[in-house]
Amino acid sequence: MAGTVQNFYDDLSSYYHLIFEDWEASMAGQAAALAPILVRECGTATQIKILDCACGIGTQALGLAKAGFRVTGADLSPRAIERARVEASARSLNLQLHFADMLHLNAVPETGFDAVICMDNALAHFSCDEDLAEAAAQIRKKLRAGGIFVASIRDYDHLIQERPVIQGPSFFSDDEGRRRIVFQVWDWIDERRYAFHLYITCDTPTGWRTHHGVSTCRAVLRDELTSMLEGAGFERVRWMLPAESGFYQPLVLGVAG
């Protein structure tokens, strides 16, 4: 998953917050959706040790740390990790951060986590079943027996039927009234894989400016991901759709056997 995916998130690290209408509110809202699941499965928030294995600039890690969880973050993008460090420091949050690909989570020295999370469709970046299965195995090794894995992924069971070519656009404005437009264009490569072009166009004092990045994803269906997690040693794998969880994407949960 490294290489071009890393470059995509390195380049996006300075702009990532702009894909949200209000990043601070999104951090709080996503933490509020995830916290009850984690507490129900693992216990008291302040005693739960979490690894966010695709933390990016910290959207979930920062929100959960602020909610009292003990959070360690890892990501394949060194620039995203550096941004997360800056954001954690600005909020006086104790967030341990590591540069680590999901295929090489041994770069994170700690083990025995109560929970590992992997949000924002990160699992879809794996281009083949073999790499996705290896990532699941790496994640299992980071968990204590009985620990929980929680991941979010797009609803590809639905999207694979429609094969959309655009997501959005979304129109936002900041506190100063400056507008921005965020959307994705999807170019389908084959039945499962697509290149997505992310556009963030901002109204600046010197005119409109656009950030454009390209990466690839693979549509992984729910039964496929369930089978891979079970093959990696997870038990009681189950799904929570947004109507149940309050999270913006479907969630998959599995207990480390």
Region spans (language model):
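A short SAM/SAH-binding and catalytic strip from SAM-dependent methyltransferases
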Residues: 114-130
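A short acidic, Gly/Pro-enriched loop at the edge of an enzyme's catalytic core
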Residues: 107-115
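A short glycine-rich, Lys/Arg-flanked "PGG" loop and its adjoining helix->strand segment in the class I
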Residues: 133-145
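SAM-dependent methyltransferase
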Residues: 150-226
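Class I SAM-dependent methyltransferase SAM/SAH-binding core
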Residues: 59-105
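Conserved class I S-adenosyl-L-methionine
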Residues: 1-56
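C-terminal lobe and adjacent flexible extensions of AdoMet/dcAdoMet transferase-like proteins
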Residues: 216-257
